[in-house]
Amino acid sequence: MDLGLNTDAVCTVMQSDGTVLARKFIDFPGEKDRLKHVLGRISRSQREHGPSRYRRQWAYAVHLNEELAKMTARAIVDFAEGQGADVIVFEHLEMKGRIRGSRKQKLHMWRKDDIQNRSEHLAHRKGMRISRICPWNTSSLAYDGSGKVKRDPDNHSLCTFANGKRYNCDLSASYNIGARYYIREILKPLPATARSLLEAEVPAVKRRTSCVHADLVQLAKALGRIAA
């Protein structure tokens, strides 16, 4: 599950061998446009009248942000339930301390945190678990193992892989998030000897902050060879 900059959420249903069963892009453009217009009015009001005049507008922006989080969380959990998912995997968000950045950036971070919390409550009611993985490089590394991605300057939802492949940035990140969860769950319960054997077969899984979907596929194949 990737809570991206371009789309409210990108969901991928994945098996432990890396097989992708379903995908879904969750987006509410109308609500985001409304929020964008409110933030624009706040900026103009602050320039013309100072900070004291935009408090009511800011409260309205926060309310719109919360409503967007509710809608997104509900859509995520409904999709997961419909696909028979057992676990919903998010990136771990570091929310300690003061969040810096523009109003838009602050609202985006608050919304991501709110979506995760609301999704967790909804998922538990439906018998699903929530898990979180390290977010480092999930978006910057291509899911196919080709290396760093280059964002499209004109369309930030798209990127180009090092091998020339064009792909959706948030979808690639969603694959990597699911893969890191399975890599951790596969390796963690194994005895040290078995884990070392698999890590020798697929060295990339030793460093979790750079693991991608392609590494899970290779790990699943190595596990099958060893089991055979």
How does the language model describe each region?
Residues 1-228:
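Positively charged, helix-rich recognition surfaces that bind polyanionic ligands
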